[in-house]
Design a protein with these regions (language model features):
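Glycine/proline-enriched, intrinsically flexible loops and inter-domain linkers
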Residues: 1-207
Length: 207
């Protein structure tokens, strides 16, 4: 912690594994308030369905961020969207990017969360002297940030071996258990076409 204000870094637990859902920085050396930030992305899902990829990227960023006690709940959060899309190299990618941006905009409007900033990189292609061309998958990286009321109350992702404790699975999506764009599909060298998404944004915000 170079500045002395780092309240939550990437490594957690006795083994210092990089498990943190979010990063948290204190605003000063004596107070309890701070700023939390978290990331979300779903490039595999976006290959099959650009709209679902955008929704999943926002969802991941938000579900990573909520482990910090946000001062005003979801109203504390602002997002940044970094669009990395091979529009100049691949036919049809302009249309896919439009669908992805619109889906992210619509989803954030329903969640009542603003996206005041972002950036774009629209080449995302590497060309070689022999004519070979490598095209990156269209991806949006969503950064979520918000004010934290108490940096000492950030929930850790480290599990404790306690028989009296319980692990819960909470369904935020109200969707079917789809495998498109999943790690399982990737392990089979596939992408899939049946991609999960969030069916009820209002419930997602409440949860």
């Amino acid at each position: 912690s170079v500045t002395g204000k780092i309240a939550r870094q990437q490594c957690q637990g006795e083994l210092q594994l990089p498990l943190s859902d979010c990063g948290v920085v204190a605003l000063d050396y004596r107070g309890e308030k701070g700023i939390a930030t978290a990331l979300g992305h779903a490039p595999q899902a976006a290959l099959a369905n650009p709209e679902a990829g955008s929704v999943l990227a926002v969802s991941e960023a938000l579900t990573n961020l909520v482990w910090a006690p946000l001062a005003e709940g979801m109203d504390s959060i602002s997002l940044s969207a970094n669009w990395m899309w091979p529009c100049r190299a691949q036919e049809g990618e302009d249309a896919r990017l439009y669908k992805a941006v619109k889906a992210l905009s619509d989803f954030c409007c329903e969640l009542q969360i603003n996206v005041p900033t972002g950036k774009d990189s629209l080449s995302m292609t590497q060309k070689y002297p022999n004519g070979e061309k490598i095209i990156s998958p269209g991806t949006v990286i969503v950064s979520a940030g918000g004010e934290v009321s108490d940096v000492k109350k950030v929930v850790s992702p480290v599990l404790v071996n306690d028989e009296k404790s319980t692990i819960y699975h909470i369904d935020f999506s109200f969707d079917k258990l789809r495998l498109g764009g999943s790690a399982f599909a990737q392990s089979l060298n596939k992408v899939g076409d049946d991609v999960p998404t969030v069916q009820n944004p209002e419930y997602f915000r409440d949860a």
